[in-house]
C-alpha cells in the first residue's frame, strides 16, 4: 500500500510539472520569462509596436518608411527594450482566467538618449537613400542606448495575464501597453533623417515639376491634384507669347518643354536650422543657356514679316532644344522655410533667383 501511495504522489507531482501552468509556472514568472525572451531572442513581438510608429511617420512625411529598414529598426527597439530593468511585484488573481501582474521600471526616453548622436549624424547625410542613411544611424543610436541611456521617472504598470489549460498568455493589447510604457519617442532617430530627406525631396519635386514636367511627387507634397498642377504649368511656365501666331504655339510649347527638360541641377542635403521647417540648402546648377542663345540669335536676324519672326523663333527654340548650351557650373544657396515659400513668386526671392540661374531668360 505504501508503494502505491508513493507512486500516486510522484505521479501527481510529475503532472503538475508538465501541466497547464507548466513546470510550476506562475503569472508573474511567465511575464518575467516573456520580457527576457523579448530582450534576448526574436524581436518580432515588437513588430506591431513598430508598425504603429511607422504608420504615424508615413502620415507625416511624403517619403515612406522603407520595408527593408524594418529588421534593423526592430533590432534597435530590442536593444532599447533591453536597456529597461524591470521589477515584477508579484501576481494577483482576478478570477480563474485572469491575473494582474504589476511592474516597476524606469522608461527609456529614446529621443533624449539618441539626441546627440542624431545631431552629429544629420550633417553627415550624404545620399538620398533613406534606408542606407537610417541603417548607419541606427548602428550609432544602438551604441548610444547601450552606453548612455536617458531615463524618465520610475513608474509602475499593471498587466492583465490570461490563464487557460495551455498556460499563461499576454494578448497583443497588453503587449503594446508594455512597450508604449517602457519606450518613449521610438521614432526620434527616424525623424532626424527623414525630415531632412523629405525637405530635400520637396525642393527637388518643385524643380522637377517646373523643369521636367514631372508633377507627381510635387502633388504628394502639396496635396494638390496632379491634373490641376499640370494645368497651371501649361498656362504659365509653358505658355507661348500672346503675340505668337496660333500655327506655331504647339511647336513653341513643345520646344520650351524640351529645353526645360535639359536643365541640370542637383539639390544637396538640407542643413537644419533653428525653428520649425527651416533649412539651408545648396543646389548645384549648370545653367541652361539655351533660351538665351535662341533669343540672342533671333535678335541678329533680319525679318520682313511677323510670320518670319514667329517661324524663326520656333525653329531656334527647336534647334537649342536638340543641342542645348550651358554655362559654368555654380552653387546656389537657398533658404527653405515658410517665409521663403510664401515669397517664392516675388522677383527678388531666393527661389526665383534659383529658377533664373537654372534657366536664364535674360
Give a label for each model feature.
Residues 68-138, 247-313:
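Surface-exposed, charged secondary-structure patches
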Residues 22-83, 87, 182-258, 265:
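Core segments of small alpha/beta cavity-forming domains
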Residues 224-362:
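A broadly structural signal marking compact, well-ordered functional cores
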Residues 119-136, 143-194, 301-311, 322-362:
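Short beta-strand edge/turn micro-motifs at domain boundaries
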Residues 17-20:
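C-terminal motif of bacterial Sec signal peptides marking the signal peptidase cleavage site
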Residues 26, 45-46, 91-99, 159-165, ...:
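Solvent-exposed, well-ordered amphipathic alpha-helical segments
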Residues 75-78, 145-149, 254-256, 320-324:
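Intrinsically disordered, low-complexity segments enriched in polar/charged residues with Gly/Pro
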Residues 1-12:
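Positively charged n-region of N-terminal signal peptides that target proteins for export
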Amino acid at each position: 500500500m505504501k508503494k502505491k501511495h508513493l507512486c500516486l504522489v510522484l505521479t501527481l507531482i510529475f503532472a503538475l510539472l508538465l501541466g497547464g501552468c507548466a513546470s510550476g509556472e506562475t503569472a508573474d514568472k511567465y511575464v518575467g520569462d516573456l520580457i527576457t525572451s523579448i530582450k534576448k531572442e526574436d524581436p518580432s513581438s515588437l513588430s506591431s509596436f513598430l508598425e504603429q510608429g511607422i504608420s504615424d511617420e508615413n502620415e507625416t512625411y511624403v517619403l515612406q518608411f522603407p520595408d527593408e529598414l524594418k529588421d534593423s529598426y526592430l533590432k534597435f527597439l530590442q536593444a532599447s527594450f533591453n536597456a529597461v530593468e524591470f521589477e515584477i511585484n508579484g501576481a494577483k488573481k482576478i478570477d480563474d482566467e485572469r491575473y494582474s501582474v504589476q511592474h516597476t521600471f524606469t522608461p527609456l526616453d529614446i529621443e533624449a538618449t539618441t539626441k546627440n548622436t542624431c545631431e552629429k549624424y544629420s550633417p553627415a547625410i550624404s545620399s538620398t537613400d533613406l534606408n542606407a542613411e537610417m541603417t548607419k544611424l541606427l548602428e550609432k543610436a544602438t551604441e548610444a542606448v547601450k552606453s548612455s541611456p536617458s531615463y524618465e521617472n520610475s513608474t509602475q504598470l499593471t498587466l492583465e495575464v490570461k490563464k487557460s489549460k495551455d498556460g499563461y498568455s499576454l494578448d497583443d493589447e497588453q503587449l503594446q501597453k508594455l512597450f508604449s510604457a517602457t519606450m518613449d519617442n521610438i521614432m526620434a532617430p527616424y525623424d532626424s533623417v527623414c525630415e531632412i530627406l523629405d525637405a530635400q525631396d520637396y525642393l527637388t519635386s518643385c524643380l522637377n515639376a517646373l523643369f521636367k514636367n514631372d508633377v507627381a511627387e510635387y502633388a504628394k507634397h502639396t496635396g494638390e491634384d496632379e491634373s490641376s498642377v499640370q494645368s497651371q504649368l501649361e498656362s504659365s511656365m509653358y505658355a507661348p507669347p500672346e503675340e505668337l501666331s496660333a500655327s506655331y504655339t504647339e511647336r513653341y510649347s513643345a520646344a520650351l518643354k524640351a529645353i526645360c527638360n535639359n536643365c541640370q541641377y542637383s539639390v544637396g542635403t538640407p542643413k537644419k536650422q533653428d525653428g520649425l521647417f527651416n533649412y539651408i540648402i545648396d543646389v548645384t546648377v549648370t545653367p541652361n543657356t539655351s533660351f538665351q542663345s535662341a533669343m540672342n540669335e533671333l535678335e541678329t536676324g533680319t525679318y520682313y514679316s511677323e510670320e518670319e519672326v514667329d517661324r524663326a523663333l520656333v525653329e531656334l527654340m527647336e534647334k537649342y532644344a536638340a543641342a542645348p548650351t550651358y554655362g559654368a557650373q555654380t552653387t546656389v544657396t537657398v533658404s527653405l522655410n515658410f517665409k521663403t515659400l510664401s515669397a517664392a513668386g516675388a522677383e527678388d526671392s531666393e527661389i526665383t533667383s534659383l529658377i533664373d540661374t537654372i534657366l536664364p531668360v535674360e
